Design a protein with these regions (language model features):
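Contiguous mid-protein beta-loop-alpha structural module that forms a pocket-lining wall or clamp
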Residues: 1-11
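Short, solvent-exposed helix-helix connector turns and helix-capping sites enriched
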Residues: 4, 15-19, 151
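Polyanion-binding interface signature
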Residues: 10-146
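C-terminal amphipathic "assembly/sorting" segment characterized by alternating charged
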Residues: 117-186
Length: 186
């Protein structure tokens, strides 16, 4: 054990009450973490809906029902299309954001041609798989520092920032999404 681990061990085993408290906390920590994450993404969804209602009602906000699914997302779709949109993906893990399309529903050769033609005009341009625009947000809700950002006293403000970031990406690149929908769907 490291010196730090030895101190933790000594502190937690110094009395039955301390050990019991640590044990109770460790048994409930995952539930607390899950609630923090769910509450945060529901706040992002709420903030996105506010932005859509105030600024561009052509977008539709969709938050996956299972935030802990590996490819879970919080998306901005254009009108009723749900085959391509602006998305935060991996909501409970290593998050990314960008302009995404559902691969089997699109003509990839048309998308590849469009990517090459528009690469200097697309924010965070990408040729990565099902992404036209891609950015790793460097946030992972399996990490302590990222979880600190969504504690109740910070969650609403941070949700506004996350919503604003996705909304701005969507507004800046709306023409590219519209092109995909109108020209590349199979």
């Amino acid at each position: 054990m490291s010196v730090y681990e030895e101190r933790i061990y000594t502190m937690l085993t110094s009395s039955e009450d301390k050990f019991k408290s640590a044990y109770e906390i460790s048994n409930h920590l995952n539930m607390v973490k899950r609630k923090l994450i769910v509450t945060f993404w529901k706040n992002v969804e709420k903030e996105l809906n506010i932005l859509v209602n105030e600024r561009d009602q052509n977008f539709k906000v969709v938050l996956d029902s299972d935030i802990f699914y590996a490819n879970s997302g919080c998306s901005l779709f254009l009108e009723d299309n749900t085959k391509a949109g602006f998305i935060y993906e991996h909501l409970s893990g290593d998050q990314c954001m960008g302009l995404w399309f559902e691969n089997p529903k699109f003509d990839i050769s048309k998308i590849d041609s469009y990517r090459i033609e528009q690469q200097n005009k697309i924010t965070n341009y990408s040729t990565y798989g099902w992404w036209i625009s891609y950015e790793n947000t460097n946030e992972n809700f399996n990490n302590f520092d990222s979880l600190l950002m969504i504690l109740p006293d910070k969650s609403m403000e941070y949700a506004k920032i996350k919503a604003q970031n996705l909304f701005e990406l969507a507004v800046e690149n709306k023409e590219h999404l519209r092109y995909l929908i109108n020209n590349c769907l199979k």
